[in-house]
């Protein structure tokens, strides 16, 4: 194969910078900012974006997917139960029925986050990696956006001021640490918010508590996924992920309803 590739350093640099600046100018004001690109965050992003709203997902690591990639103790499979399996089927994930267990399936732990991310992006959400949310924007007793910085800057310990993304709603989908709600609680003790953390593993109880705990914790701030159980002291579940996906979908539905009602 005789191919000659055009490679120009100036053109490459200019193209990257122009695309990046155009992108940032487009997303500094959004309908929903989702902090955390794990299973619940990506699920919420897809359902909200499908309704035509502007959504950005902010993930501190260079890879989205949260704890899904490693499956259970490094074995590359996760478990999902009905009816959450339908959420994965919508993005084309291949599921294998667990023999002798009604309504239980396994899924490839690499395929799942990849297809969830593609589903969110194809629906119109913007997924950014390497971005850390270090604080929240508050306006008149309401969360009104996120304060962001480069994760590389944070890791290097450099004293560099952040920038902001304004949003009608913010979602804490940061997993076990519930870092967004924790930050709001720590910086604003007068709000009376507490984050007791999750309880020890009890999969069935944790899965069902997760759905109850997915809610608006403060005006403009929702919590979903494992962050919800951390905020409201639910049990952890391990490598069964159905509750995470349903939590993300429930969070999306609640936010979409508020957006449609201009709340």
From Swiss-Prot:
Pathway: Cofactor biosynthesis; thiamine diphosphate biosynthesis. Belongs to the THI4 family. Homooctamer; tetramer of dimers. Transmembrane segments: none annotated. It comes from Methanotorris igneus (strain DSM 5666 / JCM 11834 / Kol 5). NAD(+) binds at residues 40, 59-60, 67, 133, 159-161, 179, 226. Keywords: Iron, Metal-binding, NAD, Thiamine biosynthesis, Transferase. Its cofactor is Fe(2+). It comes from the Archaea. NCBIfam families: sulfide-dependent adenosine diphosphate thiazole synthase. Binds 1 Fe(2+) ion per subunit. Gene3D superfamilies: FAD/NAD(P)-binding domain. Signal peptide: none annotated. Pfam families: Thi4. GO terms for biological process: thiamine biosynthetic process; thiamine diphosphate biosynthetic process; thiazole biosynthetic process. Its EC number is 2.4.2.59. This is Thiamine thiazole synthase. It catalyses: hydrogen sulfide + glycine + NAD(+) = ADP-5-ethyl-4-methylthiazole-2-carboxylate + nicotinamide + 3 H2O + H(+). Involved in the biosynthesis of the thiazole moiety of thiamine. Catalyzes the conversion of NAD and glycine to adenosine diphosphate 5-(2-hydroxyethyl)-4-methylthiazole-2-carboxylate (ADT), an adenylated thiazole intermediate, using free sulfide as a source of sulfur. Fe cation binds at residues 161, 176. GO terms for molecular function: iron ion binding; pentosyltransferase activity. PANTHER family: THIAMINE THIAZOLE SYNTHASE. It is an enzyme of class 2 (transferase). InterPro entries: FAD/NAD-bd_sf (IPR036188), Thi4_fam (IPR002922), Thi4_prok (IPR022828). Glycine binds at residue 236.
């Amino acid at each position: 194969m005789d191919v000659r590739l055009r490679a120009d350093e100036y053109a490459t640099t200019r193209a990257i910078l122009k695309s990046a600046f155009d992108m940032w100018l487009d997303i500094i004001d959004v309908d929903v900012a989702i902090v955390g690109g794990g299973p619940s965050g990506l699920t919420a992003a897809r359902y909200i974006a499908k309704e035509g709203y502007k959504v950005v997902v902010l993930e501190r690591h260079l890879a989205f997917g949260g704890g899904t990639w490693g499956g259970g103790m490094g074995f590359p499979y996760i478990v999902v139960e009905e009816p959450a399996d339908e959420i994965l089927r919508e993005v084309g994930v291949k599921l294998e029925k667990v023999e002798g267990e009604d309504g239980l399936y396994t899924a490839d732990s690499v395929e799942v986050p990849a297809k969830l991310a593609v589903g969110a992006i194809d629906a119109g959400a913007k997924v950014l990696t390497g971005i850390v949310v270090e604080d929240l924007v508050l306006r008149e007793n309401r969360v009104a956006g996120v304060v962001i910085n480069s994760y590389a800057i944070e890791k290097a310990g450099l004293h560099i001021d952040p920038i902001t993304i304004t949003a009608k709603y913010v979602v804490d989908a940061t997993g076990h640490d519930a870092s967004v709600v924790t930050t709001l609680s720590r910086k604003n003790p007068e709000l009376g918010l507490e984050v007791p953390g999750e309880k020890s593993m009890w999969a069935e109880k944790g899965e069902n508590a997760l759905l109850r705990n997915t809610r608006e914790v403060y005006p403009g701030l929702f919590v979903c996924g494992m962050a919800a159980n951390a905020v409201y002291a639910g049990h952890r579940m391990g490598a069964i992920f159905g509750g995470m996906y349903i939590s993300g979908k429930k969070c999306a539905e609640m936010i979409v309803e508020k957006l449609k009602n201009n709340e």
